[in-house]
Amino acid sequence: AAKPAPAADAAQPAAPDSQAAAGPVAKPAADGPAQADPLAESRSYEGALALFRGAKYTDAIAGFKNFLKTYPASTLAANAQYWIGYSYYALKDYKTSLAHQQKLVATYPDSPKVPDALLNVATNQIELDDMAAARKTLKDLVAKHPSTPAAKLAARRLAAIK
């Protein structure tokens, strides 16, 4: 798919790639209070993702929050957090979206979703007319994750909002 022009980019959150969004399913923890069911875990995540893809954002948020409550140690937890933030963005609730994307960065600092989450943080800051914070977030993203697609988009957005 073609990328939108840089000016149009500024109003869009990072578009996740479907393979990265799905990710691997976590293995059950042998020492946990109860054995996780990998199939149930996958169904829970995929069900919430299907709601998001169907533009049922409020239901998707509930589904992803339930997923995080049920499977807090899942390898998909960061992705679920990402989709919660993205869903709030789709609902134009930029403050809540911002908080959830920042939570992803703080809670899952080593997740491959961090660069996209930072791009979404900046996108929400732009929507909230906090250009100074958006510039700082974009600069930090480029500096900390320079080889990522999100950093390349961040550099274009940074040039567009200077």
List where the protein language model places each region.
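Short solvent-exposed coil/turn linkers within tandem alpha-helical repeat scaffolds
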Residues: 70-76, 106-113, 142-152
